């Protein structure tokens, strides 16, 4: 698989930095490929802008910067407004329609999956696992990481008392991703 640039963006408290760490480690540790991770967030602990950048490749990554993401996960309108126009035309955008209302910045993107990540997480019992639902969707939609690798990495990073909830969130993401892809074809 060629270089794949992945941008996860939303607001602090949605767990997207952790999501990026989980994804990068899944690829590097369990799929034995190259991965970089970079994060940034506003000065607020929660509620400010947050982004997580992951680059995946089969060869050494010499330029660890994302310019035009192949994959874009947006969990706020601000994220779409700021980064949507940079997504590659043949890329993939995954948006939470409960949080993103205006998709104009994604007009050039051919594959936009509208999946209620936060609502799915809420139905599972805690919206804090929306990031894990998103990782399930991203796994199915992109093939950039194997299911086994993402499952192991999620379990490496979540508290023991939340393992079952996080497993359910990941499975719900796999299912929602598969359904969105089937509906788009």
Language model segments and positions:
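Active-site cofactor/cluster-binding pocket
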Residues: 1-185
């Amino acid at each position: 698989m060629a270089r794949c640039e992945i941008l996860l963006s939303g607001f602090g408290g949605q767990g997207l930095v952790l999501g990026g760490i989980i994804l990068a480690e899944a690829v590097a540790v369990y799929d034995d490929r190259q991965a970089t991770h970079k994060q940034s967030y506003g000065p607020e602990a929660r509620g400010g802008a947050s982004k997580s950048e992951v680059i995946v490749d089969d060869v050494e990554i010499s330029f660890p910067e994302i310019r035009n993401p192949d994959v874009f996960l947006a969990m706020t309108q601000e994220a779409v407004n700021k980064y949507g126009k940079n997504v590659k035309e043949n890329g993939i955008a995954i948006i939470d329609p409960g949080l993103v209302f205006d998709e104009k910045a994604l007009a050039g993107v051919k594959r936009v999956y509208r999946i209620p990540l936060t609502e799915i997480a809420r139905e599972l019992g805690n919206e804090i696992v929306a990031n894990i639902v998103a990782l399930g969707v991203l796994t199915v939609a992109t093939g950039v990481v194997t299911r086994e690798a993402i499952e192991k990495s999620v379990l490496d990073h979540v508290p023991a008392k939340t393992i079952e909830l996080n497993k359910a969130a990941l499975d719900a993401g796999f299912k929602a991703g598969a359904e969105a892809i089937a509906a788009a074809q």
